[in-house]
Amino acid sequence: MKDLVLYMTIGYPDENTFFRMLDMLDEEKVPVLELGIPVGNPFVDGDLIRQSHKKVLDSGIGQKKIIRWLQRIRRDYKFCIILMTYKEGMERFCLSELDKNLYDGILCVDEVIRADTGMRPVQIYNETMTEVQMLSLLAENKNFAYVMSGNGKTGSFSCLPDGYKRTVHFLKKNTNLPVYVGFGIKTLKDVNAVCSHGA
């Protein structure tokens, strides 16, 4: 499972259940965990993730709780930790102020985080980008390149789009970073499809 990245909203549905699920992921040796930092308007996410964000926000999450959870995750688990959020989450929880040893990288959906911040950013690519735009993002990219399988919200695709194929092909030619495909990957058939096209 060295190329598997799983997403979970931090603290969802509650602290105890969240950490029990992390125990299971650790036992299965999941290599990379994308931790969603909740926001009020996760506009590229589908209903399930939107609901999870709302539940965690309603529970009263703040920066101190995020730090405490990240410290526990760092102490108890082996997987790589990628924080995934929006500009709203960056600002609301002052994520740029976090100890950078608490996580391995950060992905911000609607703002480019520069590599010189030391936050080891993961950049997002999609089929609408030009080659110049993708090369510009690669210069700011650490950890891995994240390719959206298509345009739309997570969970909104009735079948896997194929617009990602050109993007994956271009990135593989221009970087040694791993290239992962996300959004709309729901079945074993989907997994096999993206793997067969270089992801």
Residue locations for each model-derived region?
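Ordered, amphipathic secondary-structure segments that act as subunit-interaction surfaces
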Residues: Y77-L95
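Hydrophobic, well-structured mid-protein blocks that either form specific transmembrane helices
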Residues: E91-E127
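Glycine-rich phosphate-binding active-site loops on the catalytic face of alpha/beta enzymes
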Residues: P31-P42, L102-A115, Y146-G155, G184, ...
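Catalytic cores of alpha/beta
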Residues: E15-E27, L95-S96, M129-E140, N174-T175, ...
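Alpha-helix-loop-beta-strand connector modules within alpha/beta enzyme cores
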Residues: G46-I82, T117-E127, L160-V181, I185
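Conserved N-terminal beta1-alpha1 strand-loop-helix module at the mouth
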Residues: M1-Y77, A139-K142
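Glycine/Thr-rich beta-alpha phosphate-binding loop at enzyme active sites
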Residues: I49, Q133-F170
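Hydrophobic faces of well-ordered beta-strands that scaffold small-molecule active sites
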Residues: L4-M8, L33-L35, F79-T85, I106-C108, ...
